[in-house]
Amino acid sequence: MPKLRSATSTQGRNMAGARALWRATGMKENDFGKPIIAVVNSFTQFVPGHVHLKDMGQLVAAEIEKAGGVAKEFNTIAVDDGIAMGHGGMLYSLPSRDLIADSVEYMVNAHCADAMVCISNCDKITPGMLMAAMRLNIPTIFVSGGPMEAGKTKLSDQLIRLDLVDAMIEAADPNVSDERIDAIERSACPTCGSCSGMFTANSMNCLTEALGLSLPGNGSMLATHADRKELFLKAGRQIVELCKRYYEQDDASVLPRSIGTFDAFENAMSLDIAMGGSSNTVLHLLAAAQEAGMDFKMEDIDRLSRKVPCLSKIAPNTNKYHMEDVHRAGGIMGLLGELDRAGLIHKNTHTVLGMSMGEQLDQYDIIRNQDEELHKFFRAGPAGIRTTQAFSQDCRWDTVDNDRVNGCIRNKENAISQEGGLAVLFGNLAEDGCIVKTAGVDESIWKFTGTAIVFESQEDAVAGILGGKVKEGHVVVIRYEGPKGGPGMQEMLYPTSYLKSMGLGKKCALLTDGRFSGGTSGLSIGHASPEAASGGAIGLVRDGDIINIDIPNRAINLEISNDELATRRAEQDQKGWQPANREREVSFALKVFGHFATSADKGAVRDKTLLK
């Protein structure tokens, strides 16, 4: 029978000092011997997705205490990618993921916690906590802060829905008036919560449902809705139940590595492909799999992308649907239900509710279960009132969206595309693969041959786009922006947004060893591996080279001979794989990250071989 980890610091005469300190935190005599459960919060006033989380930790803690556990809360950092975007702050975003994972490990192991409830929400916080959960392998439940309501404003006598990406694109268009930009800016982000489309934050929170590590509704229930409160309360109660099953009944099936198996990771990736989620999820799932000691690779993602169709298009891939619409259509359980009916997921994986995924779908899929209370849960909708308060409204749609022919979520027979929403491309430009979010690419340019125009940094690319250097037919190559080369693997939302604002969104392609915001759409290919700083062929491209992109055949190639490629490589080996004429201040902390970082195909995790 597993012994409580916390017994290390709470039992025995030699732990009298530790117990004295525990008592100083408020523990009573009868608390010793109970599981100590870490409530891992991420409240900050810097991030709208986290601004409402201040009281959530104590909400969960109270339920843990009622259920027979001892709750101890601590906080992690949280970076807002949208605020850090477009300047040096973005260099810190991806490294913060690993810092979060380490900080959770430090706190949990230093204090011998028995389990965790992870209160996450935005881009790098959920992945960082997921990496920690897989690393620590103690009972864990995720509960996120929830999505923001979609923005709404009246323009030209028409009510439109929008988000922060609309604000960025419109602001970059010189033909758009200041008045229109101001109206969009003030309406784009109306409430607390993670940005309202299927961007990275919401994609990752949805994926925790598919992994079985969060409760149904976690990825789609609005941050503002009163029903979301029950997810926090239930997480508090359920984590104590998981502790009992593991520590008292020796049931290891409740542990993260038993729930997040290879099959569960396939379920999560299949969901991501079906919903056209952020390409960043690939990076984070690969990283989490490595923490679990699992051999889940780019080739597995490629295999899944060839058989899983695109069943839903959500902002930024369309203006028609946002996360509130996904929830109305049955949320992630609805999407997984359609994948199940198509024979495309594993039903025998476990979930934190103590049932199989198949059993959970029987209970929570609105198509197979017509229970009135279930449908009421998924009718939870937006109020359209600006607020930073969680649980502040109780509005509901009149009906759920169960239209699987033309609705927000389709069945396989009526799929938006039989090609999935993400694809892995291989070729001499990316021998270890690169990622494109096909859900955001117009099918007319799935095959694209263009002329390379090369930039050594995101800043130079932005200047080139806005300065008119980039023309129709160009493949914009932005290199030395990978995990090692940046360092930090910046997101390229500004270059892609500016291409759209300049009328080049369907007339150009963009290739980078950096990554893209979940808000990106268009022919934007990221994660080119190996990256330039690690000797990748993207570092050998020259202005005027012809690049051939073939999404249907999953190929991307530089159209030069092998001999010419070898000659260029030999020349670059002599020069060193460094960006030319780039001025960038890099802090010591970022240099450390870059020194250890692997390329994107490995999840941009640290290279453990450097420590041997």
From Swiss-Prot:
One cellular component term (GO) for this entry is: cytosol
Report the active site residues. 517 (proton acceptor)
User: So which cofactors does this thing need?
Assistant: [2Fe-2S] cluster; Mg(2+)
Example GO BP: isoleucine biosynthetic process
Q: Which InterPro entries match?
A: Dihydro-acid_dehy_C, DihydroxyA_deHydtase, DiOHA_6PGluconate_deHydtase_CS, ILV_EDD_C, ILV_EDD_N, IlvD/EDD_N
GO MF entry, a single one: dihydroxy-acid dehydratase activity
Biological or metabolic pathway of the protein: Amino-acid biosynthesis; L-isoleucine biosynthesis; L-isoleucine from 2-oxobutanoate: step 3/4; Amino-acid biosynthesis; L-valine biosynthesis; L-valine from pyruvate: step 3/4
Catalysis: reaction(s):
(2R)-2,3-dihydroxy-3-methylbutanoate = 3-methyl-2-oxobutanoate + H2O; (2R,3R)-2,3-dihydroxy-3-methylpentanoate = (S)-3-methyl-2-oxopentanoate + H2O
Cofactor binding note: Binds 1 [2Fe-2S] cluster per subunit. This cluster acts as a Lewis acid cofactor.
Ordered alphabetically, the record's keywords are: 2Fe-2S, Amino-acid biosynthesis, Branched-chain amino acid biosynthesis, Iron, Iron-sulfur, Lyase, Magnesium, Metal-binding
Q: What is its EC number?
A: 4.2.1.9
Q: Indicate the quaternary assembly.
A: Homodimer.
Q: What does this protein do?
A: Functions in the biosynthesis of branched-chain amino acids. Catalyzes the dehydration of (2R,3R)-2,3-dihydroxy-3-methylpentanoate (2,3-dihydroxy-3-methylvalerate) into 2-oxo-3-methylpentanoate (2-oxo-3-methylvalerate) and of (2R)-2,3-dihydroxy-3-methylbutanoate (2,3-dihydroxyisovalerate) into 2-oxo-3-methylbutanoate (2-oxoisovalerate), the penultimate precursor to L-isoleucine and L-valine, respectively.
NCBIfam families named among the record's database cross-references: ilvD, PRK12448.1
Protein name, as recorded: Dihydroxy-acid dehydratase
Which organism encodes this protein? Answer: Haemophilus influenzae (strain PittGG)
Q: Which gene encodes it?
A: ilvD
